[in-house]
Amino acid sequence: PVEIIIVGALKVGIKDTDIIRINVYFAGGINFEEGIWFDASIVDSEIVGIKLEGDMAFRLFWGGNTKGFLLSIGGFHPNYTPEEGMLVSDMKRMALKLDYKVLKVGLEAYLAVTSNSFQIGAHLDICVGWNKFGIRGYAGFDALFQFDPFLFMFSIEAGVSVVCGSWKLLSIDLG
C-alpha cells in the first residue's frame, strides 16, 4: 500500500507587533487502500489580546478494519468515545481566552460530525474582580445526537457567585 504523509506548520502574524499571531501545526496522510487522516493544533496564538488554542481532526476511512467519517473541531461530547480504529487521541477544546487584571473570560467549544453522530457544546467562564473579591459566572451546554442506536442527550448549566477571599457570599447554580 502507498501512503503519503505531510507534516508542517502555518504561522501568520504582523511583523513587529502582537496584533495577530497564529501558529498551527498539522499532520495528515492518505493511504490509497484505507483512507485519509488530518490533524491540526492551534498553539501559542493570539488575535488582538485574545488567546487561541485547540485541536482539529478529520478521518475518512473506506478500507481496512475501520470504515467511516469523522470531523471534530475541539473534541467530542463528554459521553462519546470515537471508534478505536479512528485513531483520535485526547483533543483540546477550541478556546478563546481574555485575561486582564479585573476581567477574565474563557470560551471553550467543540463541534463534531461522525458517520453516526452530531455533537456540539460550549462552556463560558467569566470572572470580574480581583483575586480576593469578585463575581464569577459560567454557562455551558453539551448536545449529542446519535443515529444508531438512536440517542439524544442535551445538558445545560449556568451559575453565578459573589466571592470574598475563600468564601462564597452568594451563589446560584443551575444544571
Give residue spans per PLM region:
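Extended assembly/interaction regions that build large supramolecular complexes
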Residues: 1-175
